[in-house]
């Protein structure tokens, strides 16, 4: 099964990465995740953001990620501890 975390987008780092304030973790995750972590985006399901990474800008990411409640499905972790994940908007009540 895929590990999943939820939280609020905090800071855009680059055109394909941001920092998330983790507020929820899926029961049964294989790994443990800190309260704040860098996400490198492997894929998106975010209204207002193209599926094509080459179209992304810092401004695009800011408009759909900052202060949004996000779901991150973890693909892998870098040696530095950054998470590579598919990112989508998540409803607060149902995660």
Where are these regions (language model features)?
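Small beta-barrel nucleic-acid-binding modules, primarily SNase/OB-fold domains
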Residues: 1-95
């Amino acid at each position: 099964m895929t590990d999943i975390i939820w939280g609020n987008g905090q800071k855009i780092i680059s055109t394909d990465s941001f920092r998330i304030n983790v507020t929820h973790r899926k029961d049964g995750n294989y790994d443990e995740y800190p309260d704040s972590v860098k996400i490198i985006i492997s894929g998106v399901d975010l209204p207002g953001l193209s599926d094509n990474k080459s179209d992304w800008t810092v401004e695009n990411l800011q408009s759909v990620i900052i202060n949004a409640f996000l779901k991150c499905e973890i693909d892998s972790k870098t040696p530095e501890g950054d998470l590579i994940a598919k990112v989508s908007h998540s409803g607060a009540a149902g995660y």
